[in-house]
């Protein structure tokens, strides 16, 4: 006998939780922005702090949808993107999320969303559904994964 009792060997796993953290006022601001946009997609930059696998939203930077087909796509103009990044720099924050709405569909990334998620690295996308009035968050790693939205 080698002195090891395999009946008592335990395996431990560590689960990494990816979540984006907002407060209720921020969710209300995003909801209002989406509803005011009617049948057009709304969009915003989420500024905050990224710590390990958590993205903590400190400020919402609302933007206009500059896309030529705003009912099914969104584009943030280069001028507004620059303003958003300047605002983040002034406040010592980073881009920690991208928000947009799907006025007439579910809160899930479209094929177009997935394409643009690739361009933004590991930044969560929050999508609001006008059909169900709920929010869902996603991140692209090897594939698109839903992550938790924690409301503080």
Mark where each language-model region is.
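Conserved beta-strand-loop surface patch within small alpha/beta domains used
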Residues: 9-95, 104-152
């Amino acid at each position: 006998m080698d002195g090891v009792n395999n009946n008592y060997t335990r395996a431990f796993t560590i689960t990494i939780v990816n979540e984006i953290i907002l407060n209720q006022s921020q969710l209300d601001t995003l909801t209002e922005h989406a509803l005011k946009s009617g049948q057009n997609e709304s969009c915003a930059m989420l500024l905050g702090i990224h710590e390990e696998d958590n993205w903590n939203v400190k400020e919402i930077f609302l933007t206009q949808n500059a896309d030529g087909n705003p009912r099914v796509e969104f584009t943030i103009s280069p001028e507004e993107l620059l303003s958003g990044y300047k605002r983040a720099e002034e406040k010592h924050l980073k881009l920690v999320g991208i928000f947009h709405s799907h006025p007439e569909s579910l809160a899930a990334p479209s094929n177009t969303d997935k394409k643009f998620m690739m361009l933004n690295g590991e930044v969560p996308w929050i999508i609001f559904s006008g059909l169900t009035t709920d929010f869902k968050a996603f991140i692209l790693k090897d594939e698109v994964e839903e992550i938790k939205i924690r409301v503080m």
